[in-house]
Amino acid sequence: MPPKLDPSQIVDVYVRVTGGEVGAASSLAPKIGPLGLAPKKIGEDIAKETAKEWKGLRVTVKLTVQNRQAKVTVVPSAAALVIKALKEPERDRKKVKNIKHNGNISFDDVTEIARIMRPRSIAKELSGTVREILGTCVSVGCTVDGKDPKDIQQEIQDGEVEIPEN
């Protein structure tokens, strides 16, 4: 049998959920059950936390557990931030699957997302992070300032587009 958990110890649990939906308690139970938390209640807390800004988007949620209390923090992926920047109307996730987003976002939005993602990026400079986000735009299927994101990546590579560090 595993050792008993110290209740004052801080434990981080990461869960991938769809915003605004109460996830299956059965998927949460193995992760947070041993920490002495009720999976159903945590599922409702996650749904409440993600309902406003992240409704219908797949996001990672960080649960910080201490003294049998869970604090919910949303850790959005680059794709979730790009889709949110597109400001598309919500869709019923049950009916519409594998959507190609064909909107357009500004280059300023891309740099803003890059600044948010900077701490989690592998790139040395902000320009590298911007190129990572442009790659995500390619995957999502949107354009940036009416251009193909691959073209903008090439312009950054060639030094035609400058990205200020601050």
From Swiss-Prot:
PROSITE patterns: RIBOSOMAL_L11. It comes from the Eukaryota. GO terms for biological process: translation. The keyword Lyase does not apply. Keywords: Ribonucleoprotein, Ribosomal protein, RNA-binding, rRNA-binding. Gene3D superfamilies: Ribosomal protein L11, C-terminal domain, Ribosomal protein L11/L12, N-terminal domain. Pfam families: Ribosomal_L11 (PF00298), Ribosomal_L11_N (PF03946). The keyword rRNA-binding applies. InterPro entries: Ribosomal_uL11, Ribosomal_uL11_C, Ribosomal_uL11_C_sf, Ribosomal_uL11_CS, Ribosomal_uL11_N, Ribosomal_uL11_N_sf. One of its GO terms (molecular function) is mRNA binding. One of its GO terms (cellular component) is nucleolus. Binds directly to 26S ribosomal RNA. Belongs to the universal ribosomal protein uL11 family. This is Large ribosomal subunit protein uL11z. It comes from Arabidopsis thaliana (Mouse-ear cress). The gene is RPL12A.
